[in-house]
Design a protein with these regions (language model features):
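Surface-exposed molecular-recognition determinants
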Residues: 1-256
Length: 256
């Protein structure tokens, strides 16, 4: 059988205690790449804060309960992105293991959301702040030439939109801000354009290849990605979230 692995380097094995928040966390940080892994123990109380160690405000925060079973919220991967943050009282959340549209769930990051250069806040949801439960968070910040997240509007056309990232992507995650699945593309399974092979995160299905009618198709370019079909998974008449990482970080790339 064939397997697929995506890997990010945080602190290279070193960790440190972080007391910036009301909950003391253990962090492994790669500040150059804008990435930290944050381990903490939940309190079950809304309003708690956790230090993430990045030194800049994270644009993506993924949190998972490591202790509880599926029925107690242990199966949910909460997903925050700064492009969906409207105000401290209106912070939309998605879940990596679900297809649901973003929702303003105050149980995740609290009724008055704080996400800044030192901490992120928590509500009382068991999946992100279960009492005495072991939690893990992955924090990413946009870094010029390496990591870019945001949104775009599809045009439902075979000559689809071009999304500028400032680098040639190696890895790309897309989700429509409707009830739709997460699609992940990378430069290892499709080493040349067109890009058609993708995984869908909320399903246990095998790899999708040119799935749909019309099929899912896009190009990785020197400075972003270009849609080549009108498939609703990534280019219908909707707004889409994306997260991309560079093939050659902080260097000039060429088209392929």
């Amino acid at each position: 059988e064939s397997y697929l692995s995506w890997n990010w380097l945080a602190g290279g094995g070193s960790t440190s205690s972080n007391s910036d928040g009301s909950i003391t966390s253990t962090v492994s940080v790669n500040s150059t790449a804008g990435f930290s892994i944050v381990s903490y123990t939940g309190t079950g109380s809304a309003g708690a804060t956790v230090g993430h160690g990045l030194g800049v405000t994270p644009d993506v925060i993924i949190i998972k309960n490591r202790t509880d079973s599926q029925s107690d919220g242990g199966s949910y991967w909460s997903f925050y992105n700064s492009s969906m943050f409207n105000s401290a009282a209106d912070c939309n959340i998605m879940y990596l293991n679900e297809t649901n549209a973003p929702s303003d769930d105050t149980n995740i990051h609290g009724t008055s959301v704080t996400i800044n250069s030192t901490v992120f806040s928590l509500g009382d949801y068991n999946g992100t702040n279960g009492s005495s439960d072991n939690m893990i968070a992955y924090c990413f910040s946009n870094v010029e030439g390496y990591c870019k997240s945001g949104t775009y509007v599809g045009n439902n056309n075979s000559n689809g939109p071009y999304i500028y990232t400032g680098f040639k992507p190696a890895w790309l995650l897309i989700k429509g801000l409707i009830n739709d699945d997460w699609a992940v593309f990378d430069n290892k399974r499709d080493s040349y354009n067109l890009m058609t092979r993708h995984m869908r995160l909320s399903t246990s299905a095998t790899e999708y290849v040119a799935a749909g009618s019309p099929p899912v198709e896009l190009d990785f370019t020197a400075n972003g990605f270009k849609h080549r079909n009108s498939n609703g998974q990534i280019n219908g008449s909707n707004t889409y979230f994306y997260l991309a990482f560079a093939e050659a970080p902080f260097k000039y790339a060429t088209a392929r």
